[in-house]
């Protein structure tokens, strides 16, 4: 079962702030989290049942540091449509 610790952060970009006006929140999670698990976590910890959830798998970027090549972790990005009047205030993990 997924836990709130699988949620890495809420993403704040120009696109996500524009979607916020339409009632969406963009959440970055670990790669293993599913839509149903995210729905359960949001319901348990924030008391919000999402109307709609869309997900994307994002590949981690390749980075170089002092000549050594490494890779950031892959992650999932969820676009969560919240009911009218509902919000997720903070995500202090």
Curated annotation (Swiss-Prot):
GO terms for cellular component: ribonucleoprotein complex; ribosome. Keywords: Ribonucleoprotein, Ribosomal protein, RNA-binding, rRNA-binding. It comes from Nitratiruptor sp. (strain SB155-2). Transmembrane segments: none annotated. Part of the 50S ribosomal subunit. Contacts protein L29, and trigger factor when it is bound to the ribosome. This is Large ribosomal subunit protein uL23. The gene is rplW. SUPFAM superfamilies: Ribosomal proteins S24e, L23 and L15e. One of the early assembly proteins it binds 23S rRNA. One of the proteins that surrounds the polypeptide exit tunnel on the outside of the ribosome. Forms the main docking site for trigger factor binding to the ribosome. Pfam families: Ribosomal_L23 (PF00276). GO terms for molecular function: rRNA binding; structural constituent of ribosome. InterPro entries: Nucleotide-bd_a/b_plait_sf, Ribosomal_uL23-like, Ribosomal_uL23/eL15/eS24_sf.
């Amino acid at each position: 079962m997924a836990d709130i610790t699988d949620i890495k952060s809420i993403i704040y970009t120009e696109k996500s702030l524009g979607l916020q006006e339409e009632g969406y929140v963009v959440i970055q999670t670990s790669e293993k989290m599913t839509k149903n698990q995210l729905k359960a976590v949001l319901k348990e910890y924030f008391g919000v049942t999402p109307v709609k959830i869309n997900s994307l798998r994002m590949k981690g970027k390749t980075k170089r540091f002092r000549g050594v090549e490494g890779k950031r972790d892959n992650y999932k990005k969820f676009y969560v449509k919240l009911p009218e009047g509902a919000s997720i205030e903070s995500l202090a993990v």
